[in-house]
Amino acid sequence: MFIGRTRELDTLNKLYDSDKFEFAVLYGRRRVGKTALISEFIHGKKAIYFMGVESNEKQNLENFSQSIMEYSSGNIMQTSFLSLQVALEYVFELAQNEKLILAIDEYPYIARSSKSFASTLQMLIDKYKDTSKLMLILCGSSMSYMEDHVLAYKAPLYGRRTAQMKILPFDFEETCAYFQKFSPEDMALIYGIVGGTPQYLLQMDDRISVEENIKNTFLNPSSSIYEEPENLLKQEVREPALYNAIITAVASGASHMAEISTKVGEETSVCTRYLKNLIGLGIVRKETPYGEKESRKSLYVIADHMFRFWYRFIPDNNSIISRGAA
């Protein structure tokens, strides 16, 4: 059952109802429900859905070709287009006379495998934007890539989008829709522990206590949540070890830059750069006292609920949890 995202669906449906070319950019952290949102939106509509893979250009071209051919003929074909440009132009041509959605999920994987993909898209958008009824959706989980290579001023696709949505975790009210049997107090506890990320909420069972849920997930080495924060960092940053150290320092109570620098054992200039990236990822938040300009009084706190809980309790007890003694 699909829950929430009413505002996002309304925006996408308004774009779909227009009689002209539309280009929406969706981005947000992994597990936040971007793919589920796209699936819900395109259900019952004429759409080509293609998810990029972390492979080479040839593999992505073959997969893209299959998605197009399956839409066009209803069958999986054993042939591929000559190039990604030819495949894209074919889709733009299909949308000359009718509304058609092309949803490209995990766009960064494709763009990294084909250095000319963004420029090719730019060229085709400029060529067809006045005649095509295509609704193009680019979706990505690498927030830094989407912001720097799709939304940024110097990006080839800058100025072409007609909408952009940063998909965020649910707030508390939306989170409550996932649970029917938790008491209000337990729902508040669950939200405080895992936040509003759909993938984590789906692993919480309202038929058992909050304590049992913690044991089944955070304290269970076979659970996907057990190593989730570290896995997410590895997908987003190049030096996860130092990021881990900084997050651990903040989660354990170091809130001022000098304290963080001392705990981590790095210069403040280094910590500042890494903290800036963590803020961009929505993992850390910088708070400045009311009436003060940004200064040494600024505090750093863990913004993400699940990261805060995990880094506060799991690393220090890893050996106990690993041997099943938690």
Annotate each PLM feature:
Residues M1-A325:
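Phosphate-binding site recognition
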